[in-house]
């Protein structure tokens, strides 16, 4: 078994407190009262769902026939306040602030429609945003009430699926994130017998999920026909673009709150369970870390990696999926791969990229094997190009205003990328940002400012990078000891 955990981290915890809902009118108190508990991840979960979680944990085969009653006015209220307040409106044209006016009456009406079967899902509004390669990708914006109901249903279903999902799955799950996935991968490569890395890329995964097969997979756990009808409504709601409606025959709804959970359910059955069964029968060690549709596997033996890849292609076809042949790679990587290539005079092993970091075989100061992680070059260049364009737009804005903005950008960039070993790359990134700002300031006037004059300005506004993340193995094992990251 791999070093990554095989059970989810956030079990049902002790009841810490009953939350008092703020700002509700006295007349609505009994209807809107929210009796909640906190999970280990800090998620707010209605107390009534504790039994659902316990049943899901104790009986992995149970099909839940009565779940919709868990969607209460109080849960809808919590779901509303969990939404982004500045998000663009969908086809309904309703913003968060507008819906907040008369909120309690709106939620009681919505609750009634959901339980009577009168609730209708609206199509998502499609917008197009540029990609780094010059192409565009669609962005869906859901209607506000769809977001509220979906968030409530996700809260209910998470109580079941968080007991089912594998420990090596990290994407879009309560209490988990990208750096947890990166830590798990680092530890697996460093501590386990990994000589080959398989970098999987499923072609247009979110667009090719079979609705029929997805519902069949959900039905293995969910047997409440009302919840199933809600999910089918969202799947069939379609897309509205320039006033024209189009049907969606496959894929998860664009911009839908429930889409990440649906995609995780699909991959749990299609990839995670299948891989778990496959590696239990393997003769060598196999590790896997998955974040949404981005998965990295480590193999001890080349022949098993090649056989896994061949059988996976056939398996995915049964579910309407296929690998992107141009992006899926099997490469030598790891401690033993480095030694073998050095002995053959083949140079260093190839690198691979996962969650924005390029992973490289290297050595630490003592000459021992180390996985080096640096910001992916494509991501870095894309960010610099975005900053260049925005600096041009802000060319004549006050220096202090631009400085505040750049400081915020750099801090956010460091917050994700400032891992051990990546400081030289971040220092270079800051230097390039300084040059971009300097060139922009030079274009404001015919009088070219000097470096000596602007140096203190750059030093004041642009923070120096520092390591903000602990070493992965220390952080990984600390989580496991605290019980938030078990095997």
Which residues fall in each region the model found?
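Non-catalytic terminal/accessory segments
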Residues: 1-487
């Amino acid at each position: 078994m791999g070093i990554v955990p095989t059970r989810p981290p956030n079990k049902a915890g002790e009841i810490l407190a009953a939350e008092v809902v703020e700002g509700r009118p006295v007349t609505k108190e009994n209807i809107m009262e929210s009796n909640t508990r906190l999970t280990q991840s800090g998620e707010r979960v209605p107390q009534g769902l504790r039994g659902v979680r316990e049943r899901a944990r104790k009986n992995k085969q149970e099909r839940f026939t009565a779940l919709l009653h868990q969607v209460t006015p109080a849960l809808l209220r919590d779901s509303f306040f969990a939404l982004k307040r500045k998000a663009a409106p969908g086809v309904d044209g309703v913003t968060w602030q507008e819906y907040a006016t008369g909120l309690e009456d709106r939620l009681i009406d919505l609750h009634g429609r959901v339980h009577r079967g009168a609730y209708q899902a609206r199509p998502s509004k499609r917008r197009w945003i540029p990609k780094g390669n010059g192409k565009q990708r669609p962005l869906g914006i859901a209607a506000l009430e769809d977001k509220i109901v979906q968030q409530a249903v996700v809260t209910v279903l998470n109580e079941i699926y968080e007991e089912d999902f594998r420990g090596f799955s990290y994407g879009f799950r309560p209490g988990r994130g990208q750096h947890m996935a990166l830590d798990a991968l680092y530890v697996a490569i460093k501590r386990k017998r990994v000589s080959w890395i398989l970098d999987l890329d499923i072609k247009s995964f979110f667009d090719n999920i079979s609705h029929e097969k997805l519902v069949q997979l959900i039905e293995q756990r969910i047997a409440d026909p009302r919840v199933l009808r809600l999910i089918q409504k969202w799947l069939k709601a379609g897309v509205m673009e320039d006033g024209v409606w189009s049907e969606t025959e496959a894929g998860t709804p664009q911009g839908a709150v429930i889409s990440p959970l649906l995609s995780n359910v699909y991959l749990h059955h299609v990839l995670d369970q299948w891989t778990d069964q496959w590696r239990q029968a393997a003769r060598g060690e196999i590790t896997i870390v998955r974040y949404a549709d981005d998965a990295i596997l480590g193999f001890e033996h080349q022949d098993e990696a090649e056989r896994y890849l061949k059988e996976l292609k056939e398996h995915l076809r049964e579910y309407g999926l296929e690998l992107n042949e141009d992006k899926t790679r099997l490469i030598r990587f790891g401690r033993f791969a480095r030694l073998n290539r050095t002995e053959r005079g083949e140079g260093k092993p190839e690198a691979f990229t996962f969650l924005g970091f390029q992973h490289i075989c290297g050595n630490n100061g003592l000459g021992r094997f180390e996985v080096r992680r640096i910001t992916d070059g494509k991501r870095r260049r894309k960010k610099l190009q975005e900053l260049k364009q925005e600096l041009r737009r802000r060319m004549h804005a006050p220096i202090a205003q631009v400085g505040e903005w750049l400081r915020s950008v750099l801090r956010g960039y460091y917050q994700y990328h400032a891992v051990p070993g990546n400081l030289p790359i971040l220092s270079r990134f800051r230097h390039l940002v300084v040059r971009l700002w300097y060139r922009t300031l030079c274009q404001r006037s015919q009088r070219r400012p000097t470096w000596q004059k602007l140096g203190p300005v750059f030093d004041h506004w642009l923070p120096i990078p520092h390591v903000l993340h602990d070493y992965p193995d220390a952080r990984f094992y600390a989580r496991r000891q605290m019980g938030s990251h078990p095997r």
